[in-house]
Amino acid sequence: AIKKITDETSNMGYAFVDVSPRIKKIGDNKVEVTFEIQEGTKIFIDRINISGNVKTNDDVIRRELTFVEGDAYNSSKIKESERHIRGTGLFDNIEIKIDEMVGTNKTEVDVGVTERSTGQFTVGAGFSSLDGAIGSIGIKESNLFGEAKELSLNLGLSTRKSEIDLSFTDPYFLNKDLAAGIDIFNIRRNQKTYSGYKHNIIGFKLRTGFEIIDNLRYFSSYTLKRDKIHDIDNDTSIYIQAQEGKRVTSVIGQALQYDELNDRINPTDGYRVRFDVDYFGLGGDSEHILTELKIAN
């Protein structure tokens, strides 16, 4: 009860509150509890200090804060801001402290972070009955230029397949709460030896997303790809021969996602629910609707 009262008064701007319970016996089995609250002075945020961000720009952290200089102190917004910063996936530790300015009704808020490694380099090798010997290289940076932008490049090469994927995401496109990104891909598969044909895929995907309310985001996308099956042998299966030529796939995607996970990269608590609807058509060679529901915890 004391903590709840303290939290509620803190949300009203009283950062330094003293709550004292007074217990009075009023019967054999009853007591009366009175809480005496000393609110003190209403506190306002004078300055926000950011520290520990060696690579990351201050703006990346500040835009996740739900309070600004001049606001009344609010403990709920402090906790919410910490969760938002953690949700970027750029930091191992986040600590927000208040530093009372003695003799005034103002306080400084110190936001301290410990950056995590955001660059990744992966190399893989293996064997597949479909593609033969496989090798892959992946490069990814999740904090490009210290602006939380994400860039990744994946290259795959095998005996019968080559693949390249390039992806870029800006979580605050045009300095607005609008994530935007693009994926470009090209896949070439040579199945002449075993199946008597070649298959090429080339295309791109445009992505956007924004927050509707806290934790609920809307996503939209447009995908355009071209499949080409060619160089077919005469003895190839009738099924493959029927697919010879070029096919265009055009997809408009929409999704709603509610995310309560406590960390985007390594979550330890919470859950995520996402509902996707993809509309195939819009000039493509296939027309149908695909829906998908995903739940993770």
Regions found by a protein language model. Give the residues of each.
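Interaction-mediating elements
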Residues: 1-88, 93-113, 118
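Intrinsically disordered or highly flexible coil/loop and linker segments, enriched in small
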Residues: 10-15, 217-221, 265, 284
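Amphipathic hydrophobic-ligand
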Residues: 14-18, 135, 160, 201, ...
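Gram-negative/organellar outer-membrane beta-barrel architecture
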Residues: 74-274
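Polybasic, low-complexity association/targeting segments
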Residues: 83-85, 287, 292
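A generic structural motif
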Residues: 190, 279-283
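Short glycine/proline-enriched turns and hinge-like loops at secondary-structure junctions
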Residues: 267-270, 285-290
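A translation/RNA-centric and nucleic-acid-associated enzymatic feature enriched
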Residues: 296
